[in-house]
């Protein structure tokens, strides 16, 4: 026996050491831009997550129905897509870091007004105004990430940006329920006013990369020198309404982009409505109560969405050279599987099944959405990526605007008695809306046939 042990020790000693896992090379800018831009999404999402976490208490205080509650989420998006096309136009022509910084600085002041409202209509006006700022941020942030990072790490860069809002919304939902129970729901909105204004300074100091500089550069190619942080960036191309219309027309002429727009909008819209009503669902359809419902909803977002985001980001980078249109394939498969799992949780199932399976379903669906912006950067020329992200966001915003309101309307159609009070049946509403995610997955999978031609066209145009 001793001889066997000695032989084993000798073999282990003779075995070559396992090579250390190579560190990810994030390129000349490092991870700082990705972290700062993730912070922008985080702050935006904290504010967005507070409302679902305190919605029941706000309804009791201001006295409005589920339909009006859904309108609060809808208005946030409706006003946003009014400016989404101009936002993409600006992102393709001016300094994107400065655009984001200015929006953040003003956003912090407006956010605090949520705590001062006295009527439903005042609340609606403030929520609608906040939607404009977040819409302007999105195309500029995504366009920047594509220029900061090479294609072999772009999936992870976008994953970091996409994970931050889910973490922020989870924190917003969870904190909102606790703060509202202790000192009232108005204080919950005051928590997010200051950080946004402070983050604006960090964004202002980020370097402005050249458009397209990180798109598959040759090994010997030296990148163009980056502009100093303080240097103004003039318009790079012609401007005006006609230029905006032309850019939109060019973007809409990319078949893969059209599939990405439709497929992602259906999934994102359905998920937006589900996320908006998640806390109320657990309050009404389980014995968890108000604080418990908000806590479970926050945990589902945190664990499911964030884990799905990071896993998907790494898989996109790993698979993109193995399969044609790998980001699209990953998005379609993940959303289809996630939708099937999610539907099962709205049936009459025990809590021990509902909570973990719903978290897994969210991980799949959100993970699929992470691959969408990576695919856009490959099939769209860098000079119109801002408008491409805007057009995609435009359709997603329309679906997202309708979803909370539609779910609220559907819930009011099915009565549910909770503690002697008649409320809307959210489980039935979710069962009607969730199958739309299957349709989005199908559109994504069918759109892969255009990927090769669109990648070649984008490379020649860029």
Explain the meaning of each model-derived region.
Residues 98-112, 327-342:
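Structural signature of the two symmetry-related core transmembrane helices
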Residues 161, 165-211:
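Helix-loop-helix hairpin linking two adjacent transmembrane segments in secondary transporters
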Residues 82-121:
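Conserved MFS/SLC helix-loop-helix module at the cytosolic interface between two early adjacent transmembrane helices
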Residues 126-167:
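Cytoplasmic helix-loop-helix junction between adjacent transmembrane helices
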Residues 51-52, 254-310, 365, 369, ...:
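Extracytoplasmic gate region of multi-pass secondary transporters
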Residues 63, 95, 116-122, 150, ...:
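Helix-breaking motifs and short loop linkers at transmembrane-helix boundaries and internal kinks
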Residues 16-27, 213-261, 285:
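Juxtamembrane intracellular "pre-TM" segments in multi-pass secondary transporters
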Residues 49, 77-85, 169-170, 302-306, ...:
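Residue-level signature of mid-helix packing/kink "hotspots" within the transmembrane helices
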């Amino acid at each position: 026996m001793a001889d066997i042990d000695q032989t084993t020790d000798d073999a282990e000693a003779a075995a070559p050491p396992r090579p250390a896992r190579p560190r990810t090379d994030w390129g000349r800018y490092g991870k700082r831009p990705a972290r700062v831009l993730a912070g922008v999404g985080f702050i935006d999402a904290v504010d967005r997550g507070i409302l679902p976490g305190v919605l029941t208490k706000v309804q009791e205080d201001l006295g409005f129905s589920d339909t009006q509650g859904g309108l609060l989420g809808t208005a946030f998006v409706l006003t946003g897509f009014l400016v989404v096309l101009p936002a993409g136009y600006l992102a393709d022509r001016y300094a994107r870091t400065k655009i984001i910084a200015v929006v953040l600085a003003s956003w912090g002041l407006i956010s605090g007004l949520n705590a001062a409202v006295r009527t439903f209509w005042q609340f609606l006006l403030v929520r609608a105004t906040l939607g404009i700022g977040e819409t302007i941020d999105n195309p500029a942030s995504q366009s920047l990430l594509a220029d900061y990072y090479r294609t072999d790490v772009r999936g992870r860069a976008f994953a970091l940006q996409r994970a931050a809002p889910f973490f922020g919304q989870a924190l917003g939902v969870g904190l909102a329920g606790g703060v509202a129970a202790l000192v009232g729901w108005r204080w919950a909105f005051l928590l997010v006013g200051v950080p946004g204004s402070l983050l604006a300074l960090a964004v202002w100091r980020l370097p402005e990369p050249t458009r397209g500089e990180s798109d598959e550069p040759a090994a010997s190619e030296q990148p163009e020198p980056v502009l100093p942080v303080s240097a103004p960036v003039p318009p790079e191309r012609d401007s005006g309404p006609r230029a905006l219309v032309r850019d939109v027309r060019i973007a809409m002429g990319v078949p893969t982009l059209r599939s990405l727009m439709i497929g992602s909008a259906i999934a994102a819209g359905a998920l937006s409505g589900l996320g908006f009503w998640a806390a109320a669902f657990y309050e009404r359809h389980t014995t968890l109560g108000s604080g418990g419902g908000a806590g479970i909803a926050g945990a589902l977002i945190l664990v499911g969405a964030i884990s799905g985001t990071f896993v998907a980001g790494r898989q996109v980078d790993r698979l993109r050279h193995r399969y044609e249109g790998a980001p699209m394939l990953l998005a379609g498969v993940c959303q289809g599987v996630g939708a099937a799992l999610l539907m099962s949780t709205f049936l009459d199932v025990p809590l021990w099944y509902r909570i973990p399976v719903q978290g897994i379903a969210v991980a799949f669906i959100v993970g699929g959405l992470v691959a969408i912006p990576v695919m856009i950067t490959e099939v769209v020329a860098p000079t119109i990526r801002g408008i491409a992200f805007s057009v995609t966001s435009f359709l997603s915003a329309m679906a997202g605007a309708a979803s909370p309101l539609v779910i609220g309307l559907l819930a009011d159609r099915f009565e549910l008695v909770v503690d002697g009070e008649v409320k809307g049946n959210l489980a039935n509403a979710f069962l009607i809306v969730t199958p739309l995610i299957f349709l989005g997955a199908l559109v994504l999978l069918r759109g892969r046939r255009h990927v090769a031609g669109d990648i070649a066209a984008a490379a020649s145009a860029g």
